[in-house]
A protein has these predicted regions:
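An amphipathic alpha-helical core segment
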Residues: 126-134, 144-146
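Mixed-charge, glycine-accented linear interaction segment located at domain edges/termini
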Residues: 148-175
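Short coil/turn motifs at secondary-structure junctions
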Residues: 15, 146-148
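N-terminal strand-loop-strand beta-hairpin
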Residues: 1-124, 168-173, 177-193
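Residues forming anionic-ligand binding surfaces in small-molecule and nucleic-acid pockets
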Residues: 72-75, 134-142
C-alpha cells in the first residue's frame, strides 16, 4: 500500500488450498519461499496481553538470516474484527544485540512462531501460504496496492471473495493472528466466510 505504515490483511484457514496454489502458479507471480522464525515480546511497563482483543504486537523476525524489527497496532471494529493495523518495521543487520537490549530492558518474551511461507503476488494482493509449526496451514492475504484511500473492510471483503472465486471451499477466518492462536487457543473465535 502506498501508506507503508498501514497494513490491510486477512488470515484464514481454507478447506482446500490446492485450487488457490494452482491459480497462483498460473496467474500470479511467485516471489519466494522462506523459513521465518518470529519472536514476540511485551514491554516491561505495559502488558500487551492484558487487553482483549490483543491489539499490539512487538516482533523480531529471522527470515533465513535476514532480520527485522516490527511493531503492529491493530484497529478493531465494534464487533472485535480487525481489518487493518498501523505497522512500523525496519531491517536489522544483526538480531542478537537487539535481543540483548530487550533482555536488559526487561522485555518479556511471549511466544515463538516458526513457519514456512510461500509468497505470490496477484494484482493488488500478496498471497502467502503458511505452514505454521504447532498450528497448521493458513492463507494470509495482504493489500499491496497503491491507493491510500481504500476502505479496509471493503478490501478484506474482496480478499475473501477472491478465495471463494478460486474455489477454496469453506473459509475460516480469525482476527487475532498466529501469536494469539498459540498463546490462547481456548479463546479463539473463528468466523466462517
Amino acid at each position: 500500500m502506498a501508506n507503508k505504515n498501514i497494513e490491510i490483511e486477512i488470515q484464514v484457514n481454507v478447506e482446500n488450498s490446492k485450487p488457490l496454489i494452482e491459480f497462483l502458479e498460473k496467474n500470479g507471480n511467485f516471489q519466494s519461499e522462506k523459513h521465518q522464525v518470529d519472536e514476540y515480546f511485551s514491554l516491561a511497563h505495559r502488558d500487551f496481553l492484558a487487553t482483549r482483543p490483543v491489539a499490539e504486537w512487538l516482533r523480531l523476525r529471522d527470515a533465513e538470516g535476514k532480520y527485522s524489527f516490527n511493531y503492529k497496532n491493530w484497529h478493531f471494529d465494534k464487533n472485535g474484527k480487525s481489518h487493518y493495523c498501523d505497522e512500523f518495521e525496519t531491517k536489522l543487520e544483526n538480531i542478537e544485540p537487539v535481543k540483548k537490549i530487550f533482555s536488559a530492558l526487561n522485555f518479556k518474551p511471549l511466544v515463538v512462531v516458526d513457519k514456512l511461507r510461500k509468497i505470490w503476488t496477484y494484482k493488488d494482493f500478496e498471497v502467502a501460504i503458511d505452514s505454521v509449526k504447532s498450528l497448521g496451514d493458513f492463507v494470509e492475504i495482504e493489500y499491496i496496492g497503491k491507493d491510500e484511500k481504500v476502505n479496509p473492510e471493503k478490501v478484506t471483503g474482496e480478499m475473501v471473495d477472491f478465495l471463494k472465486k478460486v474455489g477454496c471451499g469453506k473459509i475460516t477466518r480469525n482476527y487475532v493472528g498466529y501469536p494469539f492462536l498459540m498463546l490462547f487457543p481456548n479463546e479463539l473465535k473463528y468466523e466462517v466466510q
